[in-house]
């Protein structure tokens, strides 16, 4: 393998590890908040279930697509959104404050309220299992 290829591979590996560590840290925090038994099945259901909020049908997949390894697009602004799955976007979930900020904002828009620690853990459990 050539040197640039090896450097790229090492960088991607370190980003994957950072993402996994970020998810593990977030899940530990949700457990500290009383959540337990995270479920990928519940996470997927939360991701794909549409709800009517303020007269509009909304789901996580409205902006992020049903396939979290694919890029999305904001339904109102058209702004591109990087893939949610860490396998497709290794920097995803490495910044805990940023992750919490987006959970707060997106849960309020999608669910009409903030997500519970259990819901966040379920979503992260499902998202962390999605592979390219």
Where are the model-predicted features located?
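Electrostatic cytochrome c docking/interface patches
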Residues: 21-54
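Bacterial N-terminal signal peptides that target proteins for export
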Residues: 1-7
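Short cysteine/histidine-rich zinc-coordinating motifs and their immediately flanking basic loops
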Residues: 72-79
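Short microdomains enriched in Cys/His and/or Lys/Arg
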Residues: 81-97
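Bacterial N-terminal signal peptides
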Residues: 8-16
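C-terminal capping alpha-helices of c-type cytochrome domains
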Residues: 100-132
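Generic alpha-helical secondary structure signal
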Residues: 38, 94, 98-102
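The canonical Cys-X-X-Cys-His
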Residues: 55-67, 123
């Amino acid at each position: 393998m050539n040197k640039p290829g090896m450097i790229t591979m090492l960088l991607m590996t370190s980003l994957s590890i950072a993402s996994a560590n970020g998810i593990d840290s977030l899940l530990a925090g949700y457990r500290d908040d009383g959540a337990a038994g995270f479920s990928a099945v519940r996470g997927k259901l939360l991701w794909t279930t549409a709800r009517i909020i303020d007269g509009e049908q909304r789901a996580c997949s409205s902006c992020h697509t049903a396939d979290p390894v694919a890029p999305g697009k904001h339904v109102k602004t058209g702004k591109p959104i990087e893939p949610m799955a860490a396998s497709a976007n290794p920097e995803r979930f490495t910044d805990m404050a940023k992750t919490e900020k987006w959970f707060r904002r997106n849960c309020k828009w999608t669910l009409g309220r903030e997500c519970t620690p259990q819901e966040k853990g379920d979503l992260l459990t499902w998202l962390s299992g999605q592979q390219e």
